Regions:
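Mixed-charge (acidic/basic) macromolecular-recognition segments
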Residues: 95-98, 136, 152, 189
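Charged, low-complexity intrinsically disordered tails
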Residues: 11-14, 20-27, 39-41, 50-54, ...
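A short, contiguous, amphipathic alpha-helix enriched in charged residues
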Residues: 17-35, 39, 120-134, 163-166, ...
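Active-site phosphate-binding and catalytic loops of NTP-dependent enzymes
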Residues: 88-93, 131-141, 214-218
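Conserved inter-motif catalytic segment of the P-loop NTP-binding fold
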Residues: 117-138, 148-150, 156-159
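Short beta-strands and strand-coil junctions in structured, solvent-facing domains, enriched
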Residues: 53, 62-63, 87-90, 153, ...
């Protein structure tokens, strides 16, 4: 039976849904973020008369969108709310977190609270999803999926050497797996190869429908140009969006994870690209030392890729 596991890392919590040794889905959360289902209080600071939407302010000064307000809600009142969507950074804009009055919202289940905590996720499990999101590409027999996070939608292009119908059908399973691996939501556009005949397009629609039967969403049928649009609940930034808008932060957290997973005595030598230095917060470095019981030395190498940080043990 599939089971959610959670690893509480340094600067990041990571959850994966495992079925045996297969990863079915993955999620991550950065401490301090508002998340769907979270209960909060906010002061209503702006609301137009007769409207049901407004702006709230948290105790720490952050702003949040509030929907489904009672029409008689007054500015200045403190309201109990349930978060429906975390904040999402996009190229060129920032989507504020969103919430509803607690009595008007259906709380989302919190995987991070219900998952079974483990000290370490199985080797390679998180790395597979992270590497795929980092590269924005997933290869499969006969083709590849190319992912692009844009303000309008997440765009997925399918390319390959197979005939159009065979290529589209071969892409369905890796595509539907990626949706869960990256924790994608919102508007998703899939550019399949153009399939001229209706029976061919129908076969792809049916295959896609079967593969996504247990994943809540709405979608269009494939049009004559091979385009399919999916709309799913958006609860926060996907792993793909984090790579697009907070790549340094994501890479810094992965660098710390690699250092933490090394076993043995000595001193931890963590080698990173210079751009990551400022992202390794002092409290994170201290936590790494506490968890490993080893001193930490950080050195930079401009020849390294941002994502290619590596750790090793050296003699003290």
């Amino acid at each position: 039976m599939p089971e959610w596991l959670v690893e509480h890392g340094i600067g990041e919590d990571r959850a994966v849904l495992m079925d045996g040794d297969r990863v079915l889905a993955a999620k991550c959360r950065w401490p301090g973020e508002l998340y769907a289902g979270q209960s909060i209080d906010a002061k209503l600071v702006r609301k137009e008369a007769g409207k049901t939407r407004g702006l709230g302010e948290l105790a720490d000064g952050r702003t949040i969108l509030i929907d489904r307000l009672p029409r008689n809600a007054q500015e200045g009142a403190t309201l109990p709310l349930t978060v429906t969507r975390g904040a999402i950074a996009e190229r060129g804009r920032y989507k504020l977190p969103a919430a509803r009055p607690a009595d008007m919202a259906t709380p989302a289940s919190d995987v991070f609270a219900s998952a079974r905590p483990v000290r370490r996720l199985p080797q390679g499990v998180w790395e597979d999803a992270w590497d795929a999101a980092s590269s924005g590409e997933i290869a499969f027999a006969g083709g590849s999926l190319l992912f692009s996070a844009t303000p309008a939608m997440t765009q997925i292009d399918i390319d390959g050497t197979l005939p159009p119908r065979e290529l589209a059908l071969a892409a369905v399973m890796p595509l539907t797996r990626a949706l869960r691996w990256f924790d994608l939501g919102g508007s998703i556009g899939i550019d399949f190869p153009t399939i001229a005949d209706k029976p061919g397009r129908r076969a792809v629609d049916e295959s896609l429908g079967a593969a996504l039967a247990d994943w809540p969403h709405e979608r269009t049928a494939m049009n004559g140009f091979g385009f399919v649009q999916i709309v799913a609940r958006l609860e926060g930034p996907s792993l793909l969006h984090r790579m697009a808008t907070a790549r340094l932060g994501a890479a810094a957290r992965m660098a710390l994870r690699r250092a933490e997973r090394i076993d043995g005595a000595g001193e931890t030598l963590l080698t990173i690209h210079p751009a990551l230095s400022a992202k390794l917060r002092p409290e994170w470095r201290e936590e790494l030392v506490r968890r490993t019981g080893r001193p930490l030395q950080v050195q930079t190498d401009p020849a390294l890729a941002i994502e290619a940080a590596h750790a090793q043990l050296v003699s003290r």
